[in-house]
C-alpha cells in the first residue's frame, strides 16, 4: 500500500484485528511489516530521500513495528502512517523554504532525533546568527509525536539576547510538529525572517 506516492507499507492484514473481532481472543503474534521510501524511484517528479525524510521514515517504522497487531485495526495502522508522514511533509516544506534564504544543514543526533541548523546573516549589522531546530520523536496515540526545540546563538556581530531569540522562535513555530495543511503556527522560514527583521530594527536603534 502506498501513500502520496512517497512511501510504501507492506503488512499482513490477517494478523491485525478486524472490525468485528474480539481482541482478547486473538493470539498476540506480530508478523513482520516494512515501510519503504519510494519517492526517489517514481517517474514523475522524483524526490530524493533526504536526512529529514529518513528520520521520519525510521521513527514511523519503529512505531508501527511496536504496535500489538492482534489488538490493532488496519485502519488505525494506516492512520498512524498517514498522520505521521503528513508531519514529515510539513518539516520537509519548512526546511526547503528555510534553505531558500538561509544555508541549512541537517545532522542526525540519535536514533530518534535530528538537528536542523541554519545561518541567519544580517549584513547591515555584520551579524551572523546560528538558528537550530532540534527534533525529537516518540510514539504517540496516533502515530509519532515530534517535539521541536528551537534555539539561536550569535556567531559574530551584535550581542543579541540568545534566550529571547529562542523564545521568539518557540512562540512562532510551536513546540511540536503539526500535520501539513493543519498547522496553526508560521513556517520556520517565516519565523526566522521575522526574527531577522526584528534584530535589524533593534540593532539600528
Per-region residue spans from a language model:
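Glycine-centered motif in EGF-like
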Residues: 1, 18-205
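Extended alpha-helical solenoid/rod scaffold regions
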Residues: 3, 11-13
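Eukaryotic short linear interaction motifs
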Residues: 8-10, 17-20
Amino acid at each position: 500500500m502506498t501513500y502520496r506516492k512517497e512511501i510504501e507499507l507492506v503488512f499482513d492484514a490477517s494478523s491485525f484485528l478486524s472490525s468485528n473481532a474480539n481482541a482478547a481472543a486473538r493470539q498476540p503474534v506480530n508478523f513482520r511489516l516494512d515501510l519503504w521510501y519510494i519517492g526517489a524511484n517514481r517517474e514523475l517528479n522524483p524526490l530524493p530521500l533526504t536526512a529529514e525524510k529518513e528520520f521520519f521514515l525510521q521513527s514511523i517504522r519503529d512505531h508501527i513495528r511496536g504496535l500489538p497487531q492482534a489488538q490493532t485495526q488496519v485502519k488505525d495502522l494506516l492512520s498512524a502512517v498517514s498522520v505521521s508522514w503528513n508531519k514529515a511533509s510539513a518539516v520537509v516544506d519548512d526546511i526547503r523554504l528555510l534553505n531558500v534564504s538561509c544555508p541549512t544543514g541537517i545532522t542526525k543526533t540519535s536514533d530518534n532525533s535530528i538537528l536542523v541548523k541554519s545561518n541567519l546573516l544580517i549584513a547591515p549589522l555584520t551579524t551572523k546568527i546560528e538558528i537550530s531546530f532540534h527534533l525529537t520523536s516518540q510514539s504517540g496515540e496516533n502515530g509519532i509525536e515530534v517535539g521541536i526545540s528551537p534555539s539561536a546563538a550569535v556567531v559574530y556581530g551584535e550581542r543579541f539576547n540568545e534566550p529571547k531569540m529562542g523564545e521568539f522562535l518557540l512562540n512562532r513555530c510551536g513546540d511540536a510538529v503539526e500535520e501539513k495543511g493543519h498547522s496553526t503556527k508560521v513556517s520556520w522560514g517565516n519565523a526566522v525572517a521575522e526574527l531577522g527583521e526584528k534584530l535589524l530594527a533593534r540593532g539600528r536603534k
